[in-house]
């Protein structure tokens, strides 16, 4: 029988100094011993990128009872890999990535460093979740996000998650949400993605921008609709991306 407190690994893609991750630390600190291992600066949009051509390093920023904070020169996924392989003395009981400044709904899950880190935790068989607020402001109000994130973290610590499954929680920018809906990921894509400009030399340069366009037909239980209706969305995600329904058809192809 062990009396060890749960070990919770926290990371993000906005960097160790972002308000979101520090609000997350405050709302989870009574649930277990926290180890924060996060990028030393913004790494948004990194997805599951890893660093392979240059060395990475980490720096201890703070150590006190129940809380240790490191910064890392790598990507969010690098942070998870390095923390679990080289720094932590035991496997975490939970990984929480966030709180992200900005939403990670629909196909954004494929680009998100926040969700890339959560997926990496899942690959290590650590129950993992990403938490995002639909507000990019540096001083955003994370109150509702913290309330829901903490509630979900407590439940995951108690119940665990199925093998290969991790969670994606998104919270709208509202003083109070209507509730929490378990959803499917919205289908669609980004359109008008680049804004063309010129640099000082007159050469064309491009800024990433764009708008999300939902695919038709729109499923009524998707995360975008839930968020637009004032609900927080919770999507269970899978590491295994195999299309099992298409396997039989593919086997019948003449290759």
Swiss-Prot record:
Role played: Nucleotidase that shows phosphatase activity on nucleoside 5'-monophosphates.
Cofactor requirement: a divalent metal cation
Organism the protein comes from: Parabacteroides distasonis (strain ATCC 8503 / DSM 20701 / CIP 104284 / JCM 5825 / NCTC 11152)
Keywords: Cytoplasm, Hydrolase, Metal-binding, Nucleotide-binding
InterPro entries found in the cross-reference section: SurE, SurE-like_Pase/nucleotidase, SurE-like_sf
Family label: Belongs to the SurE nucleotidase family.
Domain of life of the organism encoding this protein: Bacteria
UniProt key word Metal-binding: yes
Name of the molecule in the record: 5'-nucleotidase SurE
Entry-linked Gene3D superfamilies: Survival protein SurE-like phosphatase/nucleotidase
Catalytic activity: a ribonucleoside 5'-phosphate + H2O = a ribonucleoside + phosphate
Compartment(s) where it occurs, according to its Swiss-Prot or TrEMBL record: Cytoplasm
E.C. number(s) listed in UniProt: 3.1.3.5
Predominant place of localization: cytoplasm
């Amino acid at each position: 029988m062990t009396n060890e407190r749960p070990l919770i690994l926290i990371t993000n893609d906005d960097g160790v100094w972002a308000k979101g991750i520090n609000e997350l630390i405050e709302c989870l600190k009574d649930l277990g011993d926290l180890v924060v291992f996060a990028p030393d600066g913004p790494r948004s949009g990194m997805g599951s990128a890893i660093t392979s051509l240059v060395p990475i390093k980490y720096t201890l920023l703070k150590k006190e009872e129940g809380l240790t904070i490191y910064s890392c020169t790598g990507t969010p996924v690098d942070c998870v890999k390095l923390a679990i392989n080289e720094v932590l003395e035991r496997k975490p009981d939970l990984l929480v990535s966030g709180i992200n400044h900005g939403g990670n709904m629909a196909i954004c899950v494929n680009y998100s460093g926040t969700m890339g880190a959560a997926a990496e935790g899942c690959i290590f068989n650590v129950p993992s979740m990403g938490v995002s607020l639909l507000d990019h402001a540096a001083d955003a109000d994370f109150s509702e996000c913290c309330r829901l994130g903490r509630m979900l973290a407590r439940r995951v610590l108690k119940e665990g998650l199925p093998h290969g499954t991790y969670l994606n929680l998104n919270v709208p920018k509202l003083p109070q949400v209507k509730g929490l809906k378990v959803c499917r990921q919205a289908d669609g894509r980004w359109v008008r993605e680049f804004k063309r400009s010129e640099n000082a030399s007159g050469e064309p340069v491009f800024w990433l921008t764009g708008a999300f366009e939902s695919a038709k037909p729109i499923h009524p239980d998707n995360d975008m609709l839930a968020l637009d209706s004032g609900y927080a969305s919770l999507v269970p995600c899978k590491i295994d991306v195999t299309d099992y329904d298409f396997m039989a058809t593919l086997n019948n192809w003449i290759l």
